Swiss-Prot record:
Keywords: Hydrolase. GO terms for biological process: glutamate biosynthetic process; glutamine catabolic process. It catalyses: L-glutamine + H2O = L-glutamate + NH4(+). Pfam families: Glutaminase. Substrate binds at residues 64, 115, 159, 166, 190, 242, 260. The keyword Hydrolase applies. This is Glutaminase. Belongs to the glutaminase family. GO terms for molecular function: glutaminase activity. Its EC number is 3.5.1.2. It comes from Aliivibrio fischeri (strain ATCC 700601 / ES114) (Vibrio fischeri). The gene is glsA.
Amino acid sequence: MKPTKQILEDILDEVRPLIGQGKVADYIPALACVPNDKLGIAVFTNDGEMLTAGDATECFSIQSISKALSLTLAMELYQPEELWQRVGKEPSGQAFNSLIQLEMEQGVPRNPFINAGAIVISDMLYSRFSAPKHRLLEFVRKLSGNDHIIYDRVVANSEMDHSDRNASIAYLMRSFGNFDNEVMPVLKNYFHACALSMNCVDLARTFGYLANKGIQPGISEPIVTPMQCKQINALMATCGLYDGAGEFAYRVGMPGKSGVGGGIIAIVPGEMTIAVWSPELDPSGNSLAGTKALELLSERIGRSIF
């Protein structure tokens, strides 16, 4: 079955009672004030159709969803052996901002989608781009077709003001020789990436290339090769939802990437991308109602990579 607007609306009605059972991220003060009752979904098909329901056009901070975009840029710039000697490809099984595993493994992060891995990727982008945050913003605007996407400066500044743990991660990696630049300028770019302000429609369209073998609908030149597209989707399927990746694979069965702003992007290779948003999180830091919405959609339309 193909998704329809009615299916999306019915699913949001079913998951709405979950609102109040999760917790909005409060360790970043600018995120703590987001209303907890927001709920939206957008589906973008490979033939260019966009379906929406709920608060799909309201912007929010995409947070760690941006890590998949930063990885995409890094894969364009670096040879595989350069990239993967600095960051791994395995699930961590730890909290996304954990230092314990990082020290045990000599400063090499488990994967690009935990904080340590994304900070290494930011360090690599900083080495190649004169203005990394502007390059990322240009990239997102190109993919989404929306020139009005911006960084939320309030969120970025809030993260910078509460950056001690991420700075500790960066300095620990630097002590092991896995960090090339000054820490704070790299972190500033990292926080700006997390502070991208987008909505479900923007996100669903932006990630279209991952559902289409690296080709973005409406853009002639490939964004990544088919092999790179497969690799990014594989990492999203195994590592994209922190230490809840296995639960997400079991319930939803799609490559995905979440953020503590309450957004999740999910990929149905060869067919569509799906973006959901609900700010309240489960204990793993993933959207509680958003995950349930994706689970129901997977069941209703009969889509899964498994």
